[in-house]
Regions:
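Conserved catalytic cores and adjacent C-terminal regulatory segments
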Residues: 2-334
């Protein structure tokens, strides 16, 4: 595991340094639906009386989960995390409608995302600048692991604060990491990010194309370094519930499948990670996923009505899984 993370989890035993098992938080991608894990984390912070960065040794995030990972670990001037989970939930309420607002020009030129991305990134960049400032990965209050994908090199790209602290060619601005992991194809244009040393530039898109649930990425990061895991808390952004009926689908071609195939692949990737993490973690995997009974499963429905519905689905998850959340709080706060 990252040396910083292992040191943070260390304790003294008989004069020797003993590394305690690592506590991991993984946050799914899901666009505006990131409001759900933000509210779950706000509840965890309320119950424990501690910031998320103080409860977990590693926070992994994809897309909107990567934005949360950066926001939760940005240091403030007092040496504590600058943002609470509740403050980040407010980001979705206030900035979400601006981020997912299509200009008339975009409506005309994108043709529903067929020939250009759906949204300009001005509002997204402004929000990330406001919430993340000039903080860099090396500054993170606890280890972060954020997914992206290099479209030129054709490889999975990982923003890792553990490497950023020891090698400036792996250090990036938090705002750039958050923007890269949020560069969902057809929604926002890709971004080029340059490391702190100015040695290399990477053209990146959303890590959700392969790791919508980054729990297994986090698992590999920890176990691959020889450390043990005490708990993996994996927060979803709401499960898709819309069925695709056989009689409707069997005659579909490329055009009809364009959006549904993204949903199906996303679900399949998340479910596969869920299975792998449950099997390999030997009872240490805690999945908190809301059923979207009323809210839209669209990544970009930031309407006032849907934001209220997302809050309602989050509140129901918290109520229905209250005992599980309490047990998790005891695990991570102990």
């Amino acid at each position: 595991m990252a040396a910083a993370c292992r040191t943070r989890a260390a304790r003294k035993s008989g004069g020797s340094l003993v590394f305690a098992p690592v506590k991991v938080l993984a946050i799914d991608g899901g666009g505006i639906r990131g409001l759900i894990p933000a509210l779950v984390l706000a509840e965890i912070e309320r119950r424990t009386g501690r910031p998320t960065a103080d409860l977990f040794d590693l926070i992994a995030g994809t897309s909107t989960g990567g934005i949360l990972a950066c926001g939760l670990t940005r240091p403030g001037p007092d040496g504590k995390p600058l943002h609470s989970a509740d403050a980040l939930a407010e980001l979705y309420r206030t900035e979400g409608p601006k981020i997912f607002d299509r200009s008339l020009r975009k409506k005309l030129t994108s043709v529903g995302g067929l020939v250009d991305e759906l949204y300009d990134d001005d509002a997204l960049n402004a929000a990330l600048a406001a919430y993340l400032g000039d903080a860099r990965l090396k500054d993170a209050m606890t280890d972060v692991f954020i997914t992206a994908y290099d479209i030129q090199g054709r490889f999975a790209f990982f923003f890792r604060s553990s490497r950023a602290r020891t090698d400036e060619t792996y250090d990036f601005a938090m705002a750039d990491a958050a923007r890269a992991t949020a560069a969902a194809p057809t929604y926002f244009e890709p971004i080029e990010v340059t490391d702190a040393a100015g040695a290399r530039t990477y053209p990146l898109i959303d890590g959700g194309v392969y790791a919508i649930n980054p729990a297994m990425c986090a698992y590999a990061e920890v176990v691959g370094s020889g450390a043990d895991i005490s708990v993996i808390a994996a927060l979803g952004t709401g499960a898709h519930t819309k069925p695709y009926e056989f009689e409707d689908v069997k005659g579909w071609g490329r055009l009809e499948w364009a959006q549904p195939v993204l949903d199906v692949v996303s679900d399949g990737l998340a479910d596969t990670v869920d299975f792998e993490a449950t099997t390999l973690s030997r009872g240490r995997y805690r999945r908190l996923q809301a059923e979207l009974r009323y809210a839209s499963d669209a990544l970009d429905d930031a309407s006032t009505a849907n934001l209220r519905r997302l809050e309602g689905d989050a509140e129901r998850l918290i109520a229905e899984r209250s005992a599980d959340i309490e047990a998790l709080c005891e695990e991570v706060a102990g």
